[in-house]
Amino acid sequence: MKKIQIDDCICHSKIKEHLDIKDSILSEIDKSSDGNLEQLDSFYTDSISKLDWNISDKLERPWLKIFLPVFLENLQEVIASIGYAKAVIKNVWYQQYLEGDTHGWHIHDDHFTGVYYLEFPEGCSQTEIVSPYNFKVKKIDVVEGDFIIFPAHCIHRGLPNTKKRKTIISYNFSIDGSPIKGRNSLDLEKIKKVNPNIWQPQN
């Protein structure tokens, strides 16, 4: 068996409305009575002070009503840049980290996952993502208001946090490749532009 390396990417962007939504989302999270996660054994090293993963498929949460319309608009720009037209959100949830909290190595379901750094004071712990080709670890340099998306099969983790509280929003989504209003939902023009010869008749 051999591995054939192809290019893939981590998409790194900003929520343009971050300052408009941050405080209201945090206020709704503070009002909630969600639990914590403690899972420390030979398989997992997870300690998260507050999260709502157990209801991540429910869209009626107050903070999510603020976040989701804004996120979908920003996400659409990102997925268009990599050749797709429609994302189908499967799960959205928040995680709050206090001093020493951590999220060990793990993967997600669906095509893509990612992180929005809602509350991220300077010095907070970062996200690390592993290349499945050579197992090299990439630490993602972000600031508050940024969001990233990456293939959900990539092994990744959240490093142990500092004394400052960190709040992130994570999400899983898949790409819908079915036609939209009779048009191809995959941006084949991007492929044609880079590879014009593969559209020419074969000799």
Language-model segment annotations:
Residues 1-82, 102, 199-201:
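Non-heme Fe(II)/2-oxoglutarate
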Residues 12-14, 149, 172:
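Short, well-ordered beta-strand micro-motif
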Residues 18, 28-32, 63-81, 130-133, ...:
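Hydrophobic, well-ordered secondary-structure segments
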Residues 87-154, 159-160, 165-168, 175-187:
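Catalytic core of non-heme Fe(II) oxygenases with the double-stranded beta-helix
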Residues 189-203:
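Short, cationic low-complexity segments
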